[in-house]
């Protein structure tokens, strides 16, 4: 028997090299059945609920149903590449996404992967998507304004930082337009140096057309608003688990800012589609259906998401996360299951109506049905002073307008009320992409409630407003600055403002 020394030394070297190496142990299971984006897996005995698992080819999934003999896994991707008998690996990690300032200006999917072709994400850390909302002690009452730049909202339904304000209405009533204007309105704050005033924007698109999302991103980019925004997109062609996960992923990204003493606003567009995706997953996982075939925990799905929007107290960095959930109603039915759920969770709602939209009242806000339950505490004092009477006047106007259809001989007081109401309604109209600063809104509404529009023809109201703003930006600049700094209308400032509007109104023709 010949001894080959070279071979023996090679074997020994190999053995020495591998000495002390741990064998990699990973718990694996087998796919029992797969279909409709759901895989039944046998053998993952110690898997956690919500844990990420991996299929061959790098496809990821999430364990949702932990049953006696198998695990129900929802698949984040196409299930056509997964077949019966495939091995499934545990990752040991609950679903998490990258967070941090590196995501600003980017478009990502529900797992935080970039989909905008601008290279990898520079994330500072990763966070779990589904975490517990802050308790009662670390919170603080909402007290800072979150300006949308829309007169109808900032005057009548003010939103504060840390509030949850629902935007609800039928399709094509301008729900996304309100979100877009709100994002664009934050540009002056984000361009400034005051870090405590900056408001980062996160837009979560659930179940929308890709063209719609692309259009939204294009507008943000053209107007220089994408640099302080994050877009999380789970479009209509994405699997239901991605649409279910996207709002939670966006929320985790927003919580990074909230927990670091910064401010963020997140818009979920829209939660009706998330509920539909969740219903699809639940029914395929054979969970028992409830009202309208939604699962029993669909209320908890939305409440645990929206409770994460909060205003933190000073000990916790005094950051905030404001939520603007969107719900699409069918034929103005706000008493359906999902709309009533979300109305009861949020701190108020902005109700948009189709017939107002087609009458040319845009934003199509129904002032009677819309409320803000905590926003008035956050409203700027100057706005409170001028807008206090407008809500009452509009309510009276709507009531009278209904009766006025039947009678032609109305007394002078009623005529005056109808006249003023029509002009105030006209004044609250606003074209898209033209948000106004708070001090400019104060001036315009001041002119409206103090009778400067009463003598004008309805068609001239918009022209009067534009002219007044142009005049104030040049001639009355110090008055605008004073309103911005003082945040209130003192008697002296009120007199100056009155004189300035008088001077403009005299020359208006």
Curated annotation (Swiss-Prot):
InterPro entries: ATP_synth_asu-like_sf, ATP_synth_asu_C, ATP_synth_asu_C_sf, ATP_synth_F1_a_nt-bd_dom, ATP_synth_F1_asu, ATPase_a/bsu_AS, ATPase_F1/V1/A1_a/bsu_N, ATPase_F1/V1/A1_a/bsu_N_sf. One of its GO terms (molecular function) is ATP binding. It is an enzyme of class 7 (translocase). The keyword Oxidoreductase does not apply. Keywords: ATP synthesis, ATP-binding, Cell inner membrane, Cell membrane, CF(1), Hydrogen ion transport, Ion transport, Membrane, Nucleotide-binding, Translocase, Transport. It is found in: Cell inner membrane. The record marks 370 as: Required for activity. The keyword Aminoacyl-tRNA synthetase does not apply. GO terms for cellular component: plasma membrane; proton-transporting ATP synthase complex. Its EC number is 7.1.2.2. It is a peripheral membrane protein. Disulfide bonds: none annotated. It catalyses: ATP + H2O + 4 H(+)(in) = ADP + phosphate + 5 H(+)(out). ATP binds at residues 169-176. F-type ATPases have 2 components, CF(1) - the catalytic core - and CF(0) - the membrane proton channel. CF(1) has five subunits: alpha(3), beta(3), gamma(1), delta(1), epsilon(1). CF(0) has three main subunits: a(1), b(2) and c(9-12). The alpha and beta chains form an alternating ring which encloses part of the gamma chain. CF(1) is attached to CF(0) by a central stalk formed by the gamma and epsilon chains, while a peripheral stalk is formed by the delta and b chains. Produces ATP from ADP in the presence of a proton gradient across the membrane. The alpha chain is a regulatory subunit. Belongs to the ATPase alpha/beta chains family. This is ATP synthase subunit alpha. It comes from Chelativorans sp. (strain BNC1). The gene is atpA.
